[in-house]
Amino acid sequence: MGGEITVWWGPDDMVSALGFGTEENMAAVRAMKSSLASWHDATPVCLIDRKRLGALAAEQGLAGYTPLERLVLATLGGVVARSGVTPADKRVLIVLATTKGEIGSLGSAPERCDLNRTAEVVGRHFGAAHRPLLISNACISGVSAIVIAARLIRSGRYDHV
């Protein structure tokens, strides 16, 4: 009988209204910064810097994708590059965690709001051996993804999630 499999956290990335990259986001949290601001109708919102996202997407050649797809592809592209892991490997699984999806397209292109479609687009872009696992359960999505990823690795089903 073997012992429990140790799961290591590898390269990561995050983009939020607080910043681009894990270090920038965590520095903002430690500094107790908020990106909450009034929008055109005084509704408080947190928005990702679209100019920075556009520049990042342009660097990676992501024209033709929705804003959410560009965000996911740009973020995951950096992680894949730094990790040395290829999503085409059968022992690799992409987990896509999101709270809302492409809600900006609800009025104009509702079919692009389907998170299952987003997961398929991400998988195709990276030539993934498996369709990405989609986790979308409000603000806990990211933590749920980490827990599920660790369980999938410990089960022996995947080496990298």
Question: Where on the chain are the PLM-derived regions?
Answer:
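Short conserved active-site loop signatures built around small residues
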Residues: 142
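Short, conserved alpha-helix that lines the donor NDP-sugar binding/gating region
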Residues: 146, 150
